[in-house]
Curated annotation (Swiss-Prot):
UniProt region (Disordered), positions on chain: 473-510
Organism of origin: Bos taurus
Disulfide bonds, paired cysteine numbers: C55-C58, C399-C402
Keyword Ubl conjugation among UniProt keywords: no
Name of the protein described by the UniProt record: Protein disulfide-isomerase
């Protein structure tokens, strides 16, 4: 009887343990509230993706995430990858501050208080390299040629430091640089056979890559800053295709001037046009990032709209700077020769190219409705009319918040249609740009009071008819504020980064 009771207890314990154990899909642990803590306790290093099943970015990440999980598991690594459906596990999502999809957190030793946000690229190599940097030495010691070859083959880009004295000042500087870069594997060696294998007879640093010239040898004094600059200049291809996976590398880098070739892969002489673009890129390494975009791909249509381009206008070239403000530039010539592209880049760097501001044609009936229609060509005249108080909505046709606001804005226009000095207006900011106003989120609401000093007041009050009326009747005071606050509110209201109405989302998609 006692034996039977003990057997029942043992079976019950086994059943309970099995019920909570995570399932696996393609080597990725499937977590939920019932097994999350157990997984943290069982695995020293755990990378967790919080996703939504309908999220396009999550779907694009899935195969690379699974590939990374499989690679680590095959190596016998202590690192495991996991995922949580945040739409089903809202408590977990809230606990870990999930505001967009995918959100990826790295847990070390079961620490739930301060998991580290994953910020590197979305290819398997990027994920693996980032995790290894977080769990091991900044640079692995390469004791023989096989170890060095394995490191070089493990990733699209790898960096090896060759130092006969691994305690030298140069070697220490190398380690400092290695600690800064998360998504590239670093190795260090003093082995003479490894020196010979890669044709080095003295100390040096080599960046190996599976594209372009294959390797770059560092020249000069080895310092952390110079090494970081060397890697920045050489880690990306001369020309990189924009994809879901390459986007973090493109926008996470230090090069903030990008020239874009919108090139349909179906176009005649596709290879020739791409070759011209690549030839031009050789003169601007580390200064301008050369990117090509398949303009036929449906996922890239928003980017074309952002630049005011239509598919039938491609191939085409545009340049953009991604500093505090995004500024676009358009070549004077439509020729896509290497010479013309090179000349355009030189003129831009010399400050001889003016920003390109888009504008639609002015509709004949732009002022016939209570809400006036503004485009780039009539904005200055209407918004800065010294005798009128002009309240403008800057919107995007695809923006959900703008669609919700539209009937209220129309009622506001109706309210003031006969007012002697108040004008209600709107402008499609995806097709029109003006130098006086930089739009960072949609909708952006700005008030231009009647005056000669070109004052602009941001509206950050309630988006209601009463709220707008109080603002106008108070002369632009009741509801005035910094539009940065509104941007944060929009992100809080709509946590899906894929549908984020912030113009920065377009930057992420470029």
């Amino acid at each position: 009887m006692l034996r039977r009771a003990l057997l029942c207890l043992a079976l019950t314990a086994l059943f309970r343990a099995g019920a909570g154990a995570p399932d696996e899909e393609d080597h990725v642990l499937v977590l939920h509230k019932g097994n999350f803590d157990e997984a943290l306790a069982a695995h020293k290093y755990l990378l967790v993706e919080f996703y939504a099943p309908w999220c396009g970015h999550c779907k694009a990440l899935a195969p690379e995430y699974a590939k990374a999980a499989g690679k680590l598991k095959a190596e016998g690594s202590e690192i495991r990858l996991a995922k949580v459906d945040a739409t089903e596990e809202s408590d977990l999502a809230q606990q870990y501050g999930v505001r967009g999809y995918p959100t990826i957190k790295f847990f070390k030793n079961g620490d739930t208080a301060s998991p580290k946000e994953y910020t590197a690229g979305r290819e398997a190599d990027d994920i693996v390299n980032w995790l290894k940097k977080r769990t091991g030495p900044a640079a692995s010691t390469l004791s023989d040629g096989a170890a060095a070859e394995a490191l070089v083959e493990s990733s699209e880009v790898a960096v090896i430091g060759f130092f006969k004295d691994m305690e030298s000042d140069s070697a220490k500087q190398f380690f400092l640089a290695a600690e800064v870069i998360d998504d590239i594997p670093f190795g260090i060696t003093s082995n003479s056979d490894v020196f010979s294998k890669y044709q080095l007879d003295k100390d040096g640093v080599v960046l190996f890559k599976k594209f372009d010239e294959g390797r770059n040898n560092f020249e000069g004094e080895v310092t952390k800053e110079k090494l970081l600059d060397f890697i920045k200049h050489n880690q990306l291809p001369l020309v990189i295709e924009f994809t879901e996976q390459t986007a973090p590398k493109i926008f996470g880098g230090e090069i903030k001037t990008h020239i874009l070739l919108f090139l349909p892969k179906s176009v005649s002489d596709y290879e020739g046009k791409l070759s011209n673009f690549k030839k031009a890129a050789e003169s601007f390494k580390g200064k301008i990032l050369f990117i090509f975009i398949d303009s036929d791909h449906t996922d890239n249509q928003r980017i074309l709209e952002f630049f005011g381009l239509k598919k039938e206008e491609c191939p085409a070239v545009r340049l953009i700077t991604l500093e505090e403000e995004m500024t676009k530039y358009k070549p004077e010539s439509d020729e896509l020769t290497a010479e013309k592209i090179t000349e355009f880049c030189h003129r831009f760097l010399e400050g001889k190219i003016k920003p390109h501001l888009m504008s639609q044609e002015l509709p004949d009936d732009w002022d016939k409705q209570p809400v006036k229609v503004l485009v780039g060509k009539n904005f200055e005249e209407v918004a800065f009319d010294e005798k009128k108080n002009v309240f403008v909505e800057f919107y995007a046709p695809w923006c959900g918040h703008c669609k919700q606001l539209a009937p209220i804005w129309d009622k506001l226009g109706e309210t003031y249609k006969d007012h002697e000095n108040i004008v209600i207006a709107k402008m499609d900011s995806t097709a029109n740009e003006v130098e006086a106003v930089k739009v960072h989120s949609f909708p952006t609401l700005k008030f231009f009071p009647a005056s000669a000093d070109r004052t602009v007041i941001d509206y950050n009050g309630e988006r209601t008819l009463d709220g707008f009326k109080k603002f106008l009747e108070s002369g632009g005071q009741d509801g005035a504020g910094d539009d940065d606050d509104l941007e944060d509110l929009e992100e809080a209201e709509e946590p899906d980064l894929e549908e984020d109405d912030d113009q920065k989302a377009v930057k992420d998609e470029l």
